[in-house]
Each structure stands twice: as C-alpha cells, then as structure tokens.
Amino acid sequence: MRVLNRLLQRLVILGLGIFSVWLIVFVVFDTAAQRLPWILAEGLTYGNAAYLILPRVIRMGLKLLHRKRVPSFTTTGDGLPGDPVNVALVGTLAQLRAAFAALGWSEADRLGLASSWGMIRAFVFNSPYPTAPFSTLYLFGRGQDVGFQKAIDNSPRKRHHIRFWSLSLVRAEETWAGGSANFWLNTDRPPDDERVLWVGAGTRDTGLSLTHLTFQVTHATDSDTNVERDFIIAELENIGSIEAVKVYQAGQCLATERVNHYTTDGRVTLASLVVDGR
C-alpha cells in the first residue's frame, strides 16, 4: 500500500511538472509572443514562470509529499526549502547583538522598499552596504527576528551572514512533550529581554545566481554550510563570547538548562552566550 501511495504521488508530481511546462511554453509565452516584441515576451514569460507558476506548482508538490518531518532547514515565502539550520545560541537579544558587534558584524536592515533599492544599487555598482537587508526566510511560522552579516572584501555580493529566530526556553520545554512537530510549529516570539534559544541559519554568499527550482534572482550561496557554521562558532569562541560549545548529530537530544530536547536532521552547534549585553 505504501509503495502504491508513493507511486501515485510521483505520478501526480510528474503531471504537475508536465502541466507547468505546457502552461509556461504554450500558454504564457505563445500568448505574449503574439502581442509583444520577442524580448518583452521572453521577459514576461520569465517573470510569470519564476515568480508565479513554478513556486505554486512546487508548493503543491510539497503538500502532496506530506513533508511533515521536523525540518533541518528554513523555508522561503513560497514554502520551498531555504537555508539549513546549523547554529543554536542561548542568551538575550542584547547578548546576541553584543557578540556579533564584537566580531565586527553588522545587523541587517529590515527589508523594505528603501532598503531593497539600496541593496540593488549596491549590488549593481559593487558599493559597500554593511547593513544590507536579508530576504525573508521562515521558521516557527515567522520570518527571521534578527540577522547579522560581514562583507567579504567590502563587497555586498559576497558576505558571511546568519539569520536568527528566538524561541522561549520555557515554551520549548512545554511544546516538546506534545511532539516534535509542535516545537517547530510554535509561532510565539518571546520578549526581547528574555534569555531564549536563538535558532540560527548561517551561510556564505558568493555572488549572484538564480534559484534552482524557480530561477528567481538571488545571492549565490556556498553549498558547504558546515564550513560557515564552523567559521561563525570559531569567531565567537576566539573573542570569548560563547562557552559550552557542543555539536549534535541528527536525531540526538539537545539539552541546555530548561530546554530538555531539541532535534534536527543535520548537525547543529549549540553554545551559550557569555558576553555582557548591557
């Protein structure tokens, strides 16, 4: 029965793929090509395919596959896999900010029209923008609470960066008893002055690229996120901002004071912030 269900799921996914190709090529492009110059028709087709059709088709496919396991990655606004979760720090928001400020990292601006335009200009002209905004990724049902970055060679095209989502230590302990899914589906953001678990996703941007599934314009990212995780932790260790550093393998229970359990499908480095956040 399970084999039959998987076969049916894959047939439906195949059907969605064929349908999306037909829609893009024979409906969107053919219609646009009849009414617009070729270059405009190509641009319109790309925009519809990358930002409207493919994200929705992929999201439907993910729902059909019942991706209900505890994620080891964040998700984009379209529900696609984003950056992997690879860091967990315990402390207050002030401590988190102080630790990364001591490294010379800058806190990212909130994403908006002004900051997005500033990022576009900086990217095109390769001019410094140390507080450039991040695209929004989702974990615990919300976008990142805070993010930090450090430009490489003073370029906005290449940078170390990490997003963080806060989770109350008390809330984490309570939700675990009800099952691992509840841990990740929790959407409550704790107060800024509370000592919390900061779940982070750190990656290194290497230039300009297109997303693999929808071909949207984005930063190219180094595929080896373990290197970036280890780099961030080593930097924090070198300045004495963290202690009790441990690396947890997939499926292991992670304990830190009031948090009894924390599981992941990938390796997550856990540490406690000890920097003075005042």
Predicted regions and their residues:
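Membrane-embedded segments
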Residues: 105-134, 139-140
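N-terminal alpha-helical membrane-insertion module
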Residues: 1-68
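Terminal, regulation- and interaction-focused segments at domain boundaries
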Residues: 66, 71-98
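Functional cores of ribonucleases/endoribonucleases
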Residues: 132-155, 161
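Membrane-proximal, solvent-exposed terminal domains/tails of membrane-associated proteins
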Residues: 81-82, 87-90, 150-278
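Active-site-adjacent core segments of small-molecule enzymes
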Residues: 32-37, 57, 70-76, 80, ...
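Amphipathic alpha-helical segments
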Residues: 91-111
